């Protein structure tokens, strides 16, 4: 029994720098049913597997992480409880998906972003409403809200029925560099978390929003598999740096390139 536990712990340590392939909100509480009208649940059509979350940015477009992609995606809007859906829940499928050059051309620190065009627009309702894109970048020290249906444990996959939310802080990029030495000197990501540990996104939360001082600023991308671990914050794709790309794609300019 002791040997099994030791081996399990070694496996967790080996995964400690793994990408949050489909990323929990560790240390959070159930979200208020009215605070996440823009939050989208993503599923693989073929397998039915939950892939993570996205953010509705207008009636026809969803923004999420590139690594949440599957060949055909089902998107659910107005969802809180998976078992007892809201009456105004709407379901769509992906019509087109847009990436920075290629759906494989992303790294932990660059281009982990995907725009999904829906097969038809969603309608605003009591539990569905788009979230605006940012007009300015966030400031270090900002209080940021994270949310998602990700696992509630970093040692086993326990996906909740309802989304969980937590408040974390926007940190200096150097805090992520200290935790993850492979990070470059600069990247188009945000570093966010609680340095003392205890609150974090985790497996199943990928693609969900980072909302700082009420503004959509980041997309949950990756971090330590030991979710909520001391001095191991999360990395979030910086939405503001990709505004031109996002707006150009939506306007029909599909030849636009992402920022370097």
Curated annotation (Swiss-Prot):
Q: Which SUPFAM superfamilies match?
A: Trypsin-like serine proteases (SSF50494)
Annotated Gene Ontology cellular component terms: extracellular region; secretory granule
Q: What does this protein do?
A: Snake venom serine protease that may act in the hemostasis system of the prey.
Q: Organism, per UniProt?
A: Trimeresurus stejnegeri
- Active-site feature positions: 67 (charge relay system), 112 (charge relay system), 206 (charge relay system)
Residue ranges of the propeptide: 19-24
Q: What is this protein called?
A: Snake venom serine protease KN6
UniProt note on tissues of expression: Expressed by the venom gland.
Q: What is its EC number?
A: 3.4.21.-
Question: What InterPro entries does its record include?
Answer: Peptidase_S1_PA (IPR009003), Peptidase_S1_PA_chymotrypsin (IPR043504), Peptidase_S1A (IPR001314), Trypsin_dom (IPR001254), TRYPSIN_HIS (IPR018114), TRYPSIN_SER (IPR033116)
Q: Spell out the disulfide connections.
A: 31-165, 100-258, 144-212, 176-191, 202-227
Q: Does the keyword Magnesium apply?
A: no
| Domain Peptidase S1, first and last residues per copy | 25-251
Gene3D superfamilies, per this entry?
Answer: Trypsin-like serine proteases
Q: What is its main location?
A: secreted
The signal sequence is 1-18
**Residue ranges the record marks as coiled coil:** none
Q: Name one GO biological process term.
A: proteolysis
Keywords noted in UniProt: Disulfide bond, Glycoprotein, Hemostasis impairing toxin, Hydrolase, Protease, Secreted, Serine protease, Signal, Toxin, Zymogen
Q: Where located?
A: Secreted
């Amino acid at each position: 029994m002791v040997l099994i536990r030791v081996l399990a712990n070694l496996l967790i340590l080996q995964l400690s720098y793994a990408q949050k392939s489909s990323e929990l909100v560790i240390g959070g509480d159930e979200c208020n049913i009215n605070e996440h009208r823009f939050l989208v649940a993503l599923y693989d059509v073929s397998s039915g597997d939950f892939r993570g979350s996205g953010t509705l940015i207008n009636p026809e477009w969803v923004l999420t992480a590139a690594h949440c992609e599957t060949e055909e995606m089902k998107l659910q809007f107005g969802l809180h409880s998976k078992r007892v859906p809201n009456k105004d829940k709407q379901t769509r499928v992906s019509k087109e998906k847009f990436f920075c050059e290629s759906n494989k051309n992303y790294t932990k620190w660059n281009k982990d972003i995907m725009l999904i065009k829906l097969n038809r627009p969603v309608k605003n309702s009591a539990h569905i409403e788009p979230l605006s894109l940012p007009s300015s970048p966030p400031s270090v020290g900002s209080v940021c809200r994270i949310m998602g249906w990700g696992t509630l444990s970093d040692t086993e996959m326990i996906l909740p029925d309802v989304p969980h939310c937590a408040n974390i802080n926007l940190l200096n990029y150097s805090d992520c560099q200290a935790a993850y030495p492979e990070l470059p000197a600069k990247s188009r990501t945000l570093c966010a978390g609680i340095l003392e540990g205890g609150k974090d996104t985790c497996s199943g939360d990928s693609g969900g929003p980072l909302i700082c001082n009420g503004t959509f600023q980041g997309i949950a991308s990756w971090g330590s598999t030991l979710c909520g671990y001391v001095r191991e914050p999360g990395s979030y794709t910086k939405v503001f740096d990709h505004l031109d790309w996002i707006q150009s794609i939506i306007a029909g300019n599909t030849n636009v390139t992402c920022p370097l």
